[in-house]
Design a protein with these regions (language model features):
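Signature aromatic-anchored transmembrane alpha helix within multi-pass, membrane-resident enzymes
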Residues: 65-71, 279, 412-442
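Transmembrane-helix motifs of polytopic, lipid-linked glycan transferases
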Residues: 145-171, 209, 354-357
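Short periplasmic/luminal acceptor-recognition loop of GT-C membrane glycosyltransferases, typified by
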Residues: 119, 458-498
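Membrane-interface helix-loop-helix junctions at transmembrane boundaries of multi-pass membrane enzymes
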Residues: 166-172, 257-272, 339-378, 388-391
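Short hydrophobic/aromatic helix or loop-helix immediately within or flanking a transmembrane segment
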Residues: 96-103, 115-141, 318-335
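Hydrophobic/aromatic-rich transmembrane helices and adjacent perimembrane loops
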Residues: 199-206, 243, 340-351, 369-417
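Membrane-interface alpha helices of multi-pass inner-membrane proteins
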Residues: 222-239, 245-248
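Membrane-interface micro-motifs in multi-pass membrane enzymes
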Residues: 122, 165-215, 237, 391-404, ...
Length: 587
């Protein structure tokens, strides 16, 4: 008795298990003998009845359906993304990536002078941002368009991966289960994580492409080469690829080789894939080093480690809530009402993912499907890294959503059919569609409290300083006609730091910053530095404006001469670091 790698079921066979990759692949292919002609009651021989979904297998039909679905999803996700202002209150700071892509479009391909965060997104989202800006220019909607495009690709590629090589009814059910779980991100927490800044979200696109290559390609010499190149490409943009794809692939290949002993010549495919994954790590590091040596951007080393016992205990339920929020299923603090219906429906999707992961773990060592094994290990490793790590941000485990959805699509259709739950799942899918529509027609965000780019232009203010959470947004919204650069206070002095910034921004020989836009302390629970510190440092302003919740102070001098660059190395979020700065620049 062996597991069918295509359908997840059990078939009885007298054939011995094939030990090499080519033979295993041939065993996975449907043969003509598997579909004998059927003898009717009249004694005549008839060909087997074609599936009612066979028309979907025609390539041009499938391509057309996926293209149409992708367009519809993109429009819906774009509308939902616009319900959120430009994402600036987290290390991802999407406005910064927008400016980086704009700089690259204008010749600074290596981002010379830029100090990036611990995730560069240089090879993941930045090319996407460049494409959007090439078409639409620099404006606040770039973030929304890019986010909608990324998530559309995640849903479509995830559905394709879940389908695998299955055909007919089973292939359709696989596809719909995976797509349904990801279809309708919750309006608030889901939009904030999945349809905002590029913080590990876009990384899922190249990972899904890699898994599709592993799933669809025959075991040939070029597959490990392609996988190595794609893995290195993705790791240059985001080191989380090491946890989500590199380690799982190495672990699974090692397990498969151990479980199927024999000459290395017969295990060349698994050995090559594991080697390709390991080589990609070195290649990615080499590429980053070459970029830095050539005068390009510098990348902050990721803060990687285990949380302390006290922090782990304090953050456990917060992290559980974040995981549920990722799936739109968080019921913490829920008041019964219309939102409870949405959460209950999303809980069904979350339950399917938990069920699929449990099935995958239980049958892991007997599983013949390489991609299922890789995804099971990826899910477990990513969840463990998040729960035992130091960061409680939901962005750190975004991959759980597409990985879990694909596992549900590949492992549960047969079980759902046997339990006669297919009609129920159809109703749930329809509910997901309704929620997507409701989210898409929600009014777009509008922030009237902050001075607009037009206001600054009308007052002839084109270069100034501001708080980190609001500054770059003005620059993006104005198409860089008005440029406001991020700063923070340290010991009552206005300073800046090397995190998602370009050193040239603060060069007094290149720019003349003559104003500061600052949030009124009473509007931020008195967490903002008082405006009196600005007056004490720069002297009385020539003009002061009150615009909404902000104060704009204007001087007749260049403020950059008194804004030093400080460094907080080893800090997850240096813009809010409370300790003393580092003695030298971070490496």
């Amino acid at each position: 008795v062996t597991q069918s790698p295509d359908h997840g079921g059990v078939v009885t066979t007298a054939e011995p298990e094939l030990s090499n990759a080519d033979g295993a692949e041939e065993a996975a292919q449907p043969s003509a003998a598997a579909e004998p002609d059927l003898q009717g009651a009249d004694g005549a021989t008839h060909p087997p009845k074609r599936s009612e979904f066979a028309w979907l297998e025609r390539r041009w039909v499938a391509a057309g359906v996926f293209a149409a679905a992708g367009i519809v999803l993109f429009v819906a996700y774009l509308a939902q993304a616009r319900t959120l202002p430009v994402h600036l209150d987290a290390p991802s700071g999407s406005a910064w990536q927008t400016l980086q892509a704009w700089d690259m479009l204008h010749g600074n391909v290596l981002l010379r002078g830029w100090s990036l965060a611990d995730v560069s997104v240089y090879t993941t989202e930045l090319p996407e941002y460049m494409l959007v800006e090439l078409i639409r220019g620099l404006n606040g909607d770039v973030v929304h368009v890019a986010a909608a495009l990324s998530y559309t690709l995640i849903v479509v590629l995830g559905a394709l991966l879940a389908k695998g090589r299955a055909t007919g009814r089973e292939g359709l059910i696989r596809l719909l289960v995976a797509a349904g779980i990801m279809l309708a991100p919750s309006l608030h927490s889901g939009t904030d994580v999945l349809l905002s800044g590029p913080d590990h979200t876009g990384t899922q696109v190249p990972l899904l492409v890699i898994w599709l290559v592993l799933d669809r390609a025959r075991a040939r010499w070029w597959v490990p080469v392609v996988v190595a190149v794609l893995l290195a490409w993705a790791q240059v943009g985001d080191a989380i690829v090491l946890v989500e794809c590199v380690l799982p692939l190495v672990v699974v290949c090692a397990v498969r080789m151990y479980r199927r002993p024999g000459p290395l010549a017969q295990q060349w495919y698994e050995l090559s894939l594991a080697g390709a994954a390991l080589v990609s790590v070195g290649v990615a590091k080499l590429v980053l080093a070459v970029i830095k040596q050539a005068g390009g951007f510098t990348l902050r080393s990721p803060v990687i480690g285990f949380s302390t016992a006290a922090s782990m205990s304090a953050q456990f339920w917060v992290k559980v809530q974040r995981v549920l929020e990722l799936f739109g299923a968080s019921f913490f603090g829920l008041t019964l009402g219309h939102s409870a219906i949405s959460i209950a429906i999303h809980l069904i999707g979350f339950a399917l993912v938990v069920w699929a992961v449990a099935v995958g773990v239980r049958r892991f060592f007997g599983e013949s499907d390489l991609i299922v094994q890789v995804l099971v290990v990826a899910f477990v490793l990513l969840l463990a890294a998040y729960m035992f790590g130091t960061k409680p941000d939901a962005n750190e485990m975004i991959g759980l959503l597409p990985i879990g959805a694909v596992l549900a699509g590949r492992l549960l259709p047969g079980r759902l059919s046997r339990a006669r739950l297919a009609p129920t799942m159809g109703v749930v899918l329809a509910c997901y569609g309704v929620m997507l529509l409701v989210n898409a027609v929600h009014p777009a965000a509008s922030d009237q409290s902050q001075p607009s780019a037009k206001w600054f232009e009308a007052h002839h203010l084109t270069y100034g300083l501001g708080q980190v959470a609001d500054s770059s947004k003005v620059t993006v919204d104005s198409g860089a006609r008005v440029q406001v650069r991020p700063t923070r206070f340290y010991n009552h002095q206005l300073v800046t730091t090397s995190w998602q910034t370009d050193a040239s921004w603060y060069d007094a020989n290149q720019h003349d910053a003559n104003f500061v836009v600052w949030k009124v302390p009473s509007t931020c629970a008195n967490a903002c530095q008082p405006v009196t510190d600005l007056r004490n440092e720069f002297g009385p302003p020539a003009t002061t404006y009150q615009v909404g919740n902000f104060i704009v102070l204007v001087w007749h001098k260049n403020l950059l001469a008194n804004v030093p660059m400080l460094y907080w190395c080893g800090n997850v979020w240096p813009w809010n670091a409370s300790g003393p700065p580092s003695a030298k620049a971070c490496s």
